[in-house]
Amino acid sequence: ITINVKCTSPQQCLRPCKDRFGQHAGGKCINGKCKCYP
């Protein structure tokens, strides 16, 4: 699930993904946007 959060590294996506989808969510940075894996 791509969310509207800009990023340059996967670390920047972990917090917003966990906030939205819970503790077990992961995140990647793809094309400058965060993609979450709930």
UniProtKB/Swiss-Prot annotation:
The record marks 37 as: Aromatic residue of the functional dyad. Expressed by the venom gland. It is found in: Secreted. Disulfide bonds join 7-29, 13-34, 17-36. GO terms for cellular component: extracellular region. SUPFAM superfamilies: Scorpion toxin-like. Its main location: secreted. Keywords: Disulfide bond, Ion channel impairing toxin, Neurotoxin, Potassium channel impairing toxin, Secreted, Toxin, Voltage-gated potassium channel impairing toxin. Pfam families: Toxin_2. GO terms for molecular function: ion channel inhibitor activity; potassium channel regulator activity; toxin activity. The record marks 28 as: Basic residue of the functional dyad. This toxin is found in the venom of both male and female C.limpidus. Belongs to the short scorpion toxin superfamily. Potassium channel inhibitor family. Alpha-KTx 02 subfamily. Inhibitor of voltage-gated potassium channels (Kv). It is capable of displacing the binding of radio-labeled noxiustoxin (AC P08815) to rat brain synaptosomes with high affinity (about 100 pM). It is also capable of inhibiting transient potassium-currents (resembling I(A)-type currents), in cultured rat cerebellar granule cells. About 50% of the peak currents are reduced by application of a 1.5 uM solution of this toxin. This is Potassium channel toxin alpha-KTx 2.3. It comes from Centruroides limpidus (Mexican scorpion).
